[in-house]
Amino acid sequence: MTVKLQHRLARLAAMTLLGATIVSVSGCSSLWPFSSDNANKPMALAADPGRVQIRSLWSTRLGDVRFPLTPGVSASSMALAATDGTVVLLDTTSGRDLWRAKLPDTLTAGAGTDGQTVAVVTQGNDVVAIQSGNVIWRSKLASRAYTAPLVAGGRVFVLTADRTVTALDGKNGARLWTQNRQQGEPLVIQQAGVIFAVGDTLVTGHSGRFSGINPANGSPRWEAPIAFARGSNDIERVVDLMAPFSRQGDVVCARAYFSTVGCVDARQGQVLWTSQSRGAVGLGGDARAVYGADQDGRVHAWNRRDGARLWSNEGFMYRGLNAPAAEATRIVVGDASGYVHWLSKDNGALLGRAQIDNSPVLFQFATGAGSVIAVSRNGTVTALSAQ
């Protein structure tokens, strides 16, 4: 199999056809970073240098997660959801449930929150809003969603797979407006996209660009492209922006699928820089740098100001890395074998690791209080501290 064909099939495996079933590529196990195929055999882990001591602060169970889970974080609480309809609001300090609900639905996106209302999306294309463990309303969407709803300003904003943005009333789920930004692309990515607020502007990602929208009526304000659709077929032309993204003030950095990473001034709608990088997971970052893992498992750091490459770590090739998260002095990245790795921000060197279970780590969130909360595909939720 040629390298070009491997890249094309890897892109295809992460997409869905609009209005159709999930596209799967069988018989070619070398597509995935954690494949058992010899061509892409996961690199053996280096010896743990033990430069940080890692301990578990608390652990709890969520349920299997088979969709692109995005945590909803507000103050000291975190909203999480599982495929089986479990929705929970956790206290990030103790790990205890503030409340837990069980919906009679399979979930495909979640969990957005403003600290009071948690919003998720079901396989039946319903947005479900929950407060204190009780469903307060449901609202039907016209398309499947893989991106967690944004709950802000008394509204719930939803980005669906067909690149439509819908605004719902936070009190009753009534539809306020809908904006469709699809530009004829027949393929979409079965991963979480980009939606957030900067000041009085709603910002979403579609077709390689950030779009600023008036949240009151859905009218466009600006666009800032960090990638352009190129290629000889529909697969190669998919360049949607992917979660997670990195925000510092008005500057937001994101990855365009298998194309570039880049940063924009989200208040002005101005592109600051872009850099080529073939990857299928989002980014982390801090005031100094942006951190990401490419498709082959290299971890990179880019200067946040101008995009200059600061360092790369090739010690995790084909291990199925997720998007790095930034602590005060370290970055943290998870892999497909359930390991969470701590790296130096200065040069990317490995500092230590811990295994939370034997399933892929979906994400790890740096709380800002000296701990990292990691969630695995099998539903393990663990807070870890590195000293």
Sequence positions of predicted segments:
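Short loop/turn segments that connect beta-strands within beta-propeller blades
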Residues: 91-94, 131-134, 169-172, 215-217, ...
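Loop/turn-rich, solvent-exposed surfaces of beta-rich toroidal or solenoidal domains
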Residues: 293-300, 308-342
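Extracytoplasmic beta-rich repeat domains
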Residues: 36-42, 50-72, 99-115, 136-152, ...
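Bacterial N-terminal signal peptides that target proteins for export
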Residues: 2-16
